[in-house]
Each structure stands twice: as structure tokens, then as C-alpha cells.
Amino acid sequence: MLIDTFTIIAICTLVLLVILSSVLNPFMRKVESAADADENEVAESEMPAVSIVVLATGTTETLDAHLSVLLTQNYEQPYEVIVVGVKGDLSTEDVIGKYSVDHKNLYSTYIPQRSLFISKQKLSVALGVKAAHNEWIVLLDAKDRPASSMWLRKMAAKMDKDTNLVLGYSNYDPEAKPYYRFDRLRNECYLLRKASRKTAYRTESGNFAFRRSEFLEQDGYLGNLQYVGGEYEFLINKFARTYGSRIAVSPEAFVIEDVPTKKAWFNRKLYLKSIRKDLERTSAARSLYVADLLFMYLNYIAIIAAAAYSGLTMNWILLGTSALTLILTITSRILSARKAYRKFEADLSLWTVVFYEFSIVFHKLSVILRYRMADKYDFTTHKL
């Protein structure tokens, strides 16, 4: 049987798209650069004193559960834990009082119940930084808990003299919806890789360290006080400098975030959408993300179109090629995901990878729709 020109072109196109969509995959790329290798870590004797700032606005129960892990870190150098709560929150004060009896490195400071022209989270960060006694500050939310007692040591191992930001990996508790955990992992692969390779763009959550002096010298959140969200994103985006960021991605450095509600998960997406236009380096960061999705969907569309056409025209060679490229695509994406799942210890089913990836665009559309329907004053502290 002779193969016509159209069939040859179609087969070549399918093969090319399979290759491109496999390469353009965040799970395929290595997250760490050579600079973040273990042999380049700071010696234990040279690790700095650290201040851990914990944001505890309305999270008393989780604060009580997580403080014990923070206060018993296996860290040889001095470190302090500063809890920032809301003034008048007696339950938070009780929790701090309970732990401060045995832990003299536990401190607290409080924000007023009402704050004008700045969100409570940003005000909490600013007060926590000012209350800190050390140059290096690690920022956490009370709903975050370190995965091990080695967490602080693994983060501090990246705090060398040439570094001003250290980003760690964070994901939701295994009880959270699998798609939420998949989405966080996929986004972290982009953000951690960018931080490790050149200049950090933003972060998905807490579990990062920065220098107190830079925060104070550059007036903290000045320039984005009008936004309710973005307390993590703006810090990374503003203070990141070229080749000045390092990442800590060993399992001991992981942080586990409590299970989010559906509303909380969507709110985080909405807040990000509201601030993205004011984040620097957005175009460069988004271009790779868009390219990955574009070629993934083009690949699937081409396979489906080729299969439908070949079935109608009884072009069995093209139909067989369509089936083969579909198998290769699914296999490639599962194997790439398995690599990332193992590295970040993600308890996710490999068989759901294709479905989760395919549904990304629908989740994006849902966020866009919610954002357009929302009151834009919900995203700003300046409501005059």
C-alpha cells in the first residue's frame, strides 16, 4: 500500500507534537540547578541564627498543633519563634502562654483587630520582621507544619553569604483533594526551578526565608499595600535578585499545609489573579507555562483529529499512528509525573495525571469566571 503525501505529513506532525509536548512538561524538567546540590550547602557550624515568624490570625487550633514541631527543631544555632496574632485573641494568647513556660525562645506580638489600608497578613509580616532579632527570617503560616525536625537545618543550609532568598517546597496535607495537591506540585515545579536557575518570580505559599535588613531598607510591602492578597508573592517578587535565590527541596525541608476548604483554595487563585499584573517578570514566567499547556492540548487535538479523519477515510496507517502516538503521549506524561511524585513524595495516583492535566484549562476558566463576577473591592484595602 502506497502512502500519500498527506498521510506522511500527518504522521510527521503527530510525531513532532508528541516529542514537543513531552519535552514541554514541567514534570520532565529538573528543578534543582548545580548550585543547589548538597555539596554546596553551608556547614552546620556556619549556619546563621534564624527567626521563624508565624502568622496566626484566626488559626488557634492549628497553631497549638504545630508549635511543638517548630520549637523542637534539631538546629544547633540559636533560633527564635515569633507568633504574630490578633490583639484580644485570648485563645492564641493561651496557646503561647502554654508553650512559653518551657521554651524561652518563643515570642509573640499582636496586630490590632482592625487595620486600615493594609491587610492583616501583610501587617503581621511587617510586625514580625520588626520584632525579629536575627538577620535571616523564615516565614510560615500557622496552618503550615514542618515535615520533620530537620526542616530548619535544611533551610539554613542554603543561607550562604551570596543568597538573599531561600525557597522551600510546600504542599497540602494528604487528606486534601488530590487535584489541589497535583496543582500545587505542578506550580511548585515551575516556581522552584525559576528560583534555582536565575531569578525567583513568586511562591505558592509560606516556607521561605529572606533577609530582615532588606525588608526594612526597602520598606517591606511599600508599592503593593493596596492589595488584600499577595503577602508571599510580593516578598519574593520584590526582593529576588539574579542568582540570589536558592531552593531547599529535600524531603526534610518540606512543609505540609492544612487541608483547604474549596472557598479558601479558590480565594488564593483569585487573589493571585488580582495581583499578577503588578508582579515583575510575569511575562517571562508565564510564557513557559502557556507553551507547556498549548503544546499539550495541540498534541491531543491533533491525535483526535487524525484518528477521526483516518477512521472516516479508512486510512489504517494514519489510524494506527494516531493510536501509537496517543499511547506514547500518555506513557510519557505518566513517567514524567512519576519522577516528580517520587522526588516530592506526592501520594497521588499516576493514572489520574492525564485527566488532571487535561482539566487545567477548565479550572482556569472557572477562576476567570469567578473573578469577573466578584466585587473588585474584595481584593483591595483601599475602598474609598
Predicted regions and their residues:
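Acidic donor-binding/catalytic loop of UDP-sugar-dependent glycosyltransferases
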Residues: 141-157
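Short aromatic/hydrophobic "clamp" motif used to bind/position activated sugar donors
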Residues: 137
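Acidic donor-binding segment of Leloir-type glycosyltransferases
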Residues: 68-114
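N-terminal membrane-anchoring/stem segments of glycan-assembly enzymes
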Residues: 1-43, 337
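Membrane-embedded multi-pass helical conduit in multi-pass membrane proteins
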Residues: 294-377
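Long helical/loop segments within the catalytic core of UDP-sugar-dependent glycosyltransferases
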Residues: 110, 115-120, 124, 155-222, ...
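Catalytic donor/gating beta->alpha subdomain of glycosyltransferases that bind UDP-sugars
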Residues: 159, 165-167, 171-187, 216, ...
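Cell-envelope/extracellular polymer assembly enzymes that use nucleotide-activated donors
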Residues: 48-51, 80
